[in-house]
Amino acid sequence: MRGELKWAASLVAVAVVSTTGPAWAEAGAAEDIVVTAARTALPANALPLTVDVVGKRALDQQIAISGSVTDAVATLTPSFSPTRQKLTGAGETLRGRSPLYAINGIPQSTPLRDGSRDGFTIDGFFVDRVELIYGSNALQGIGGTGGIVNQVTVGAPEKEGVSGRVLLQGSADNSFHDDGLGGKVGGLVQYKAGDFDATIGATFEKRGVFYDGQDRRVGLNLTQGETQDSRTTNFFARLGYAITPTGRLDLIASRFEMKGDGDYVAVPGIRRPWRSPLQDMPTSAIRGNPPGQPAASRTESIALSYTDSDLWGGNFVSQIFFNRSRDTFGGEIATQATFQDPAIAPVNTLFDQSQNRSRKLGAKFSYERTILNALTATIGFDALADKTEQALIATNRAWVPPSDFRSLAPFAQANLKLFDGMVRLAGGARWENVRIRIPDYRTLASTTFVACTTPPTATPCGAASYGGVAVAGGAPKFDDLLLNGGIVFEPWDGIRAYASYAEGFTVPDIGRITRAFSRPGIDIDSNLEIAPVISNNREIGVEIKRGPLDASATYFWSSSKNGQLLIANALGVFDVQRQKVAIEGLELSLRAQLPIQGLRAGIGYAHLKGRFDSNNDGVVDSDLDGANISPDRLNLSLSYDRGPLSAIIQHQIYFSRRFDGLARAADDANPLHPQRLSNNDFGGYALTDASIRYDTGFGGVSLSVQNLFDKFYIDYSSDTRLPADNFAIFAGRGRTFTLGWDYRF
């Protein structure tokens, strides 16, 4: 990686020099940004939070490079895990915990049975900006233990008459293989007449197969699903009416579906032995017909909102919504041990695949008012009902029984401005009242399977041990008061320091827990494993936004006494373990306008360290692995935006990581390394992307290149998870070109 580090050092030097140049003469006040995900009309600089907003221009640029909102956010955010470039985003975390994905504040995550498809629920063509709130918080309810990724859809048209946007894109791998070609078309039409407005749009995208930096097809994960070799459609509509000069009614609906074409099957790779001089051979793909239905994800949502920015002198926001998702997991060619049941078919002959089905009905209300131009107070109430199940669709069995989740949550926030805004004190509380209802059910037959040995060590064993266990259902209730508080000190405009404490609330992946029970006599009402995860986040930060300079530094530490980890079992299926978790990290960011007008340099860095209690003695003693935390990262960028021309070149360095702990120490002490834990270490890699766009007057023409230098690498997830699975050694995507044309009218 020496060459990449030299390249990085040179760009760092450019950025540092730029901060001392004549561009300082252009210093001015930073624009106030309101983050709707924070549930307040106050600007972001009034809140003791670390927030980022990815605007439409930057978002479109990143999507042109990588293809999705999730990839765009992960690329721009150093403390976000590198994406797996798959449909399922299991193990992709923000600050070492799962973020809450939302669209206009509507939660997309399904914590009862987390299928990790929440990053693909709307096409980026319809997203106006992405709001990121870092760290555990309960501002949007359950699920925000790692932060919030809120996708705000396109707004109402501002000018009378008809307007809109058209997008055409084509993509190709480095060698322009026929099966690697892809394309996208999108259209959006808006109409405004007086107080009424309407927006309607649709997109269609066909993705070809991916090729790695060695011109080999990237392997397929048939079960979890792929973005390659897929088709995506999204229909979007928005109707609005201004009831009063300050009051507005909006109805927003979306239907998103991504479905695999099912044209390929996986070819196993080769995981080299520990300390082998040979490079791992990644999983690949050949043409074939996998069994069952291809992996797919479908999300349908509709929301009705009423907002009034001057209702009795305050800001009123209300929303009711319905969200329904159906996530199909593909079938493997080899029969899966988990699905075997001799009562249905002989062992090792039974094929099956699963499907998550979830629907949510919810409402949100908040009212905010400023008193005496100093105290801004907010009161609100959220309600959510979620029903989720995971079915085996080939044999019509229940893997995860239909589970009902109900949450009622009143909350209050206050923000006090002192000394003419030099100091702000903020704080609040949210009371979460949760009920989880699960009916009586029986686990799959394979949960009680015991392999026969010679001599026998268990009776019964083999086929006679299949059968599963009966589990008594229940309706346990949980409630918790979640607190937050902080202080903001802004001695000069654009320079501020802050410190804060916040608590986040979520439920563990109950589906993974309930489907894994293997001993009789379990009662849901008394089972502690389904108790909520309460995490806290403490952080201190400094920000400077003056003139050409935009810099920040944040240190945070987070803990949960009974957190959740994803741990692979003997069959390679990830189960949930409830253990104490502690995470801390440092985030640095520097963006500066260079002396050349329109030219900017940027640097971002994140260092994260996470530990968990592996032996339940109350002390964190082992590192979180790649399924639960991201690697340290350095982001570098150089961008130009002036007149009709805009361009960017960006470089991401993912640093190597060794995972230590009690199990690793025991393995290192054994010269045979029976656990091969070193195979879970991360070797690191560096990637470069570029994009250029020119506005011709009749639309903009863009050319984007992902992985500019065609780097071959094994992705972070594959390098650190399932070291013994030769079907899970996935290489990252090689050099990929995307040519686009977009036109606004």
Where are these regions (language model features)?
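Membrane-embedded beta-barrel scaffold of Gram-negative outer-membrane proteins
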Residues: 168, 305-334, 338, 490, ...
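Transmembrane beta-barrel wall of Gram-negative outer-membrane proteins
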Residues: 177-208, 212, 216-263, 298-310, ...
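C-terminal beta-signal and adjacent terminal beta-strands/loops
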Residues: 505, 653-669, 693-745
